[in-house]
């Protein structure tokens, strides 16, 4: 019984073992030794090569760490995670990732229980952190909100929103606040807007505009394509109002304390996924289209929506928000909705040192490649 595949190879004579152990004594292989090697049966050589390959594969599989990444929705905002899975970016980092769809609050509960490792419910996670939950934000996919404002023909500019009915998800949510800022920059007071809560379903709000129940609403990149095909027009990309990082990912403080190396490897895989979507949106859609839950959207619509989304992703290496962006995020996504007056130190909710390191490493690799 052989202990390993390598036992199939005949033992070398004593002379050969000495040569192998002390090659400096025999700087050039003798003709006899060459002939002796060449005389080995091909089956033996093939078995040895196969053994080496199998050992490498098994070793790689054993070393891969199993992790779970939760995203709140299987929409275009998280296409990059599916692309990172499909292209093996997490696997390249020694991680065997499983992507699951879990809504915000449930996702944070799963993170705290250890059932998942990373959560894309960044807003929910950081608001929970403010209440004492041991989680922190570790990256943001986008530097800006990804919303567009669409309207019926009666609304052509921000000033036209005065007295109009705006379909929103819920009062005070991120879309409501950003839409209000857009109106205020057009000289319209927040009090002059009529808000109608209709929930998060984009098609419901778009159809409300078509039936006259509302005049305008905010939509995500995929929703913009749907709205335009229904005859609505876009007043603009709300992400251009000001930098405010969006779609944050969080992990547990325990993970940060005990396994920062894994976090860096996960970040590298996730960021490479974002960069792949930006560089090849059509190919990325083809890779992720079976995972996305986008109803009856065609491939062309999804590609167009993906390009709309990419306006919010920073160049050249995404993931790390600007100082101004962090300040805006804390103000508009944390303090205002939670009615907090005192300042919030960023480090209370965020741990961005690791994504900063990963960003520098990727940039250094790009510079070496471009030389």
Annotate the PLM regions:
Residues 46-57:
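Bacterial N-terminal signal peptides
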Residues 58-64:
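Sec/Tat signal peptide C-region and signal peptidase I cleavage site
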Residues 330-371:
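Conserved C-terminal helix/tail region of periplasmic/extracytoplasmic solute-binding proteins
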